[in-house]
């Protein structure tokens, strides 16, 4: 490690030493010595010592079954501790200047000033700032809630140890606490033994809100308010809500039979219970603080004329409201059929009395008190509402069509699924305009159809505040959207929900503009949506379908076309980005990704999925979450106030060529290579992943299908485990080399310099290339694949090396990620610890496949390696 990372190096070393002590106490010297031997051999092998690479392989092969789990756990834990140390380093006092970049908002304000942007325009853009982060479950996030809480506490210890004025006693006490936490982590199950239920996943999401976001939101808004006062001489409006949250956990039923209407109902109840619980803690804190006696007439009226401490009197009323709400929701969660509703139903019930207290304190000369904890609670009320997070519902388009098909057959008017698109639209618009009900009372629908209708009834029974959007996956046509509106209407839904088509495949992205245009041509629909349309752009399935380069261009194209349609039609458009943590699923550093979008595509704000493992890395600690909010806010403001250039026509023309060539190259392997599927199944842990309890959702949409039916997550995840990361690069470098050979190098270099969309693509590829490891991939092949399949693996690795040269050539760089030394260092730091896990995993796969039966010990060791590699690879799961 370079000395410029001295503080990080010191923390990593200390945590490693404490982990070593724990391992020694738990397992004795033999295991610790094995771990140390493997670590040293790995370090030497990374430095190019081939003899030590061979020794490392032999050392791992010689491990008896009973030693595999503790050795794997050692490297797994070390990677988790390294992640904590690195995450902490980005917010620590000793953070290196080039790691902790200057404050994103202040940097932006300076840039806006230099570019002569009017401050009134800036103030308006900030008032319109709208960041909605949608928390989604993720099978690769197998870190249990228990472990996450310990990780937060370890972070707190690192923060204390950084204080220079600690006494010997305080330092010793903190170090002891750190050692205890590491020991607790070691002796706890790091991995779930059973597949999590959708309810478990929802609780995981609530834990993130409680442990981090609850504190981070008011902190971020307080900081933003101060920056605005400095730059614009006006603060943030008190009711501003620039950041808010939705969730898919318990609402995403696409291909997940375990998310039923009853699960959704329970998650909605739990969400409200958790919100009431957190507000209750805030209110109790405020009761102890607001002991003042002086107040205005409004507060006197609310508190009662005889109350000596009026603020406390109002807060005690809120305490009763929240306690009663918790009690009733608790009873409902536990299955009691209560006719009574929970008393807390709307945001106004919290906001109005708290805001009255705030205004009174300010009017009575106590602004300093008003701007403290009370303001934080008011900010939370706006951000989290009474539901904590709004729930999205997601369902696959054919499930809605099947409801209508079964219904039309019952009514004797034909089979909806066999009708033309024109006939479907005519039927749907007629029924939407009709005042009579469509569903017959005596109709007994099949179980699957009943489930869809029951979900719609759950939506109808809740307030609008409870929900974000109804997302239609695999949306292809205008009728897919109209069908959901009709089913919601027939279920008695009293409000208009955002019905959001998700365009996922290459063809669907290319067709998105036509679908939205068709919807806008229907007057009835225009009335329904009240001038606002949300559209979701699918990143993962489009990349799985066509490769990252073609998918990236199709996404850009679709966004650009949709923005134009919205402008022509005079509607507000919100683009919802279904990005994952990985490059193959659209992941990129947030700031760069947002600035690489088409001009005007962020006018309607940002709505983006944050998934499992990325939630922890970007939002898992309050200070880290504040940094993430700052990055999002500055990128959106910059994109709207200093929009990126419109791409030149010759850039577009070349992107069309790159897209076509890369798609053909990608599909020629994934679809056209006869050995590809057997190679994929043998050289990666794909088959084993499907059997492990990694998430509530099955790995395949269709249990009998091949690669095309695999979900995007296991598809990417399998390749990231064996370090070939194939979906994240295949086709892209080949297309770039093709264009160089055709004489377009100068144009490619210009695009790289001047077009954020293109330079971000190449930057993402560089990061992937640095995380790939051809030697490890070859080792998996040699240990696990039939000899007849080895030439395919060699060809793919040769292609990888050629692609790296092509990208570096266009960027005029000698080394990967040379413009991001911190990113480079971060990846290198982990490699020493990931490689032993890779070799252990290959060995475990070999032993389990040879035996044909997986013993409990081997299965646990395998899961530990999977979790460890995921932790080490960071955004490649």
Swiss-Prot record:
UniProt enzyme class:
lyase
The gene behind this protein is ppc
Please write the reaction equations for the catalytic activity of this protein. oxaloacetate + phosphate = phosphoenolpyruvate + hydrogencarbonate
Which cofactors does it use? Mg(2+)
Q: Which residues form the active site?
A: 138, 544
Checking InterPro entries in the record gives: PEP_COase, PEP_COase_bac/pln-type, PEP_COase_Lys_AS, PEPCASE_His_AS, Pyrv/PenolPyrv_kinase-like_dom
Q: Could you read off the lineage of the organism from its UniProt record?
A: Bacteria, Pseudomonadati, Pseudomonadota, Gammaproteobacteria, Vibrionales
What GO CC terms are in its UniProt record? cytosol
**PROSITE patterns the UniProt entry points to:** PEPCASE_1, PEPCASE_2
The entry's keywords: Carbon dioxide fixation, Lyase, Magnesium
Output this protein's name. Phosphoenolpyruvate carboxylase
**Enzyme Commission number, as recorded:** 4.1.1.31
* GO biological process assignments: carbon fixation; oxaloacetate metabolic process; tricarboxylic acid cycle
Q: Which domain of life is it from?
A: Bacteria
UniProt source species: Vibrio vulnificus (strain CMCP6)
Question: Could you confirm whether the keyword Aminoacyl-tRNA synthetase appears in this record?
Answer: no
Pfam families hit by this protein: PEPcase
Give GO terms: molecular function aspect only.
magnesium ion binding; phosphoenolpyruvate carboxylase activity
Family note: Belongs to the PEPCase type 1 family.
Role noted for this protein: Forms oxaloacetate, a four-carbon dicarboxylic acid source for the tricarboxylic acid cycle.
């Amino acid at each position: 490690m370079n000395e410029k990372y001295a503080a990080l190096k010191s923390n990593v070393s200390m945590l490693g030493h404490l982990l070593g002590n724990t391992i020694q106490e738990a397992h004795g010297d033999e295991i610790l010595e094995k771990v140390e031997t493997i670590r040293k051999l790995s370090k030497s092998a990374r430095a190019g010592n081939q003899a030590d690479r061979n020794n490392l392989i032999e050392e791992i092969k010689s491990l008896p079954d009973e030693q595999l789990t503790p050795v794997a756990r050692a490297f797994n834990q070390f990677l988790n501790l390294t992640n904590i140390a690195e995450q902490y380093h980005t917010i620590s006092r000793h953070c290196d200047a080039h790691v902790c970049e200057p404050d994103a908002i202040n940097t932006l304000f300076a840039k806006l000033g230099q570019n002569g942007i009017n401050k009134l325009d800036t103030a308006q853009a900030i008032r319109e700032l709208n960041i909605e982060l949608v928390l989604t479950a993720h099978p690769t996030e197998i870190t249990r809630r228990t472990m996450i809480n310990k990780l937060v506490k370890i972070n707190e210890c690192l923060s204390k140890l950084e204080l220079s004025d600690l006494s010997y006693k305080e330092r010793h006490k903190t170090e002891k606490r750190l050692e205890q936490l590491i020991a607790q982590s070691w002796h706890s199950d790091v991995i779930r033994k059973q597949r999590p239920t959708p309810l478990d996943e929802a609780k995981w999401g609530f834990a993130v809100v409680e442990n981090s976001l609850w504190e981070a939101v008011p902190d971020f808004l307080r900081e933003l308010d101060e920056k605005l006062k400095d730059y614009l001489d006006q603060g943030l409006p008190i009711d501003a809500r620039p950041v808010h949250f939705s969730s898919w956990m318990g609402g995403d039923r696409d291909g997940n039979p375990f998310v039923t209407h009853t699960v959704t109902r329970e998650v909605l109840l739990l969400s409200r219970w958790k919100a009431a619980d957190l507000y209750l803690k805030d209110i109790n804190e405020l009761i102890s603080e607001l002991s003042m006696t002086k107040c205005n007439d409004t507060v006197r009226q609310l508190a009662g004329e005889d109350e000596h401490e009026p603020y406390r009197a109002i807060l005690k009323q809120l305490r009763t409201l929240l306690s009663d709400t918790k009690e009733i929701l608790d009873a409902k969660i536990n299955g009691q059929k209560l006719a009574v509703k929970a008393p807390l139903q709307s945001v106004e019930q919290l906001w109005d009395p708290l805001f009255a207290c705030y205004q009174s304190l300010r009017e009575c000369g106590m602004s300093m008190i008003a701007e403290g904890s009370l303001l934080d609670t008011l900010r939370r009320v706006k951000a989290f509402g009474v539901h904590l997070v709004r729930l999205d519902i997601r369902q696959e388009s054919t499930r809605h069509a099947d409801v209508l098909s079964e219904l039309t057959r019952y009514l004797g008017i034909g089979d909806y699924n066999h009708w033309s698109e024109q006939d479907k639209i005519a039927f749907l618009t007629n029924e939407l305009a009709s005042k009579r009900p469509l569903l017959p009372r005596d109709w007994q629908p099949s179980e699957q159809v009943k489930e869809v209708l029951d979900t719609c009834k759950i939506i109808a029974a809740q307030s609008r505040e409870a929900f974000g959007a109804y997302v239609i996956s695999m949306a292809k046509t205008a009728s897919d959207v109209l069908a959901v509106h009709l089913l919601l209407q027939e279920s008695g839904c009293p409000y208009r929900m955002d019905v959001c088509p998700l365009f996922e495949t290459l063809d669907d992205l290319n067709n998105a503009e036509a679908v939205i245009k068709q919807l806008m041509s229907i007057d009835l629909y225009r009335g329904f949506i009240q001038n606002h349309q949300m559209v979701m752009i699918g990143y993962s399935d489009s990349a799985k379908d066509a490769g990252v380069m073609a998918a990236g261009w199709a996404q850009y194209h679709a966004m650009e076309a949709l923005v134009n349609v919205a402008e022509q039609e005079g509607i507000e458009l919100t683009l919802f980005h279904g990005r994952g943590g990985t490059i193959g699923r659209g992941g990129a550093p947030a700031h760069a990704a947002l600035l690489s979008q088409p001009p005007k595509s962020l006018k309607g704000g940002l709505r983006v999925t944050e998934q499992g493992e990325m939630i922890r890395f970007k939002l898992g600690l309050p200070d880290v979450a504040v940094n993430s909010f700052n990055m999002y806010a500055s990128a959106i403001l910059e994109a709207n106030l200093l929009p990126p250039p419109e791409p030149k026509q010759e850039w577009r023309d070349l992107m069309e060529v790159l897209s076509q060539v890369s798609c053909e190259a990608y599909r020629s392997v994934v679809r056209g290579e006869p050995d590809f599927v057997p190679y994929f199944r043998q050289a990666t842990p794909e088959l084993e992943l499907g059997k492990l309890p990694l998430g509530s959702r099955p790995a395949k949409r269709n249990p009998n299908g091949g690669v095309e039916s695999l979900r995007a997550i296991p598809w990417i995840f399998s390749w990231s485990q064996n370090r070939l990361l194939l979906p994240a690069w295949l086709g892209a470098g080949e297309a770039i080399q093709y264009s160089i050979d055709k004489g377009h190098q100068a144009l490619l270099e210009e695009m790289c310099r001047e077009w954020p969309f293109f330079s971000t693509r190449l930057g993402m590829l560089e990061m992937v290339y640095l995380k790939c490891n051809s030697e490890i991939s070859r080792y998996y092949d040699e240990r696990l694949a039939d000899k007849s399949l080895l030439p395919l693996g060699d060809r793919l690795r040769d292609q990888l090396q050629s692609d790296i040269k092509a990208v570096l050539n266009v960027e005029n760089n000698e080394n990967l990620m040379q413009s991001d030394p911190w990113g480079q260092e971060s990846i290198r730091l982990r490699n020493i610890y990931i490689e032993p896990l890779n070799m252990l995993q290959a060995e475990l796969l070999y032993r389990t496949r040879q035996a044909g039966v997986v013993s409990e010990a081997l299965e646990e060791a395998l899961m530990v390696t999977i979790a460890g590699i995921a932790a080490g690879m960071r955004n490649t799961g």
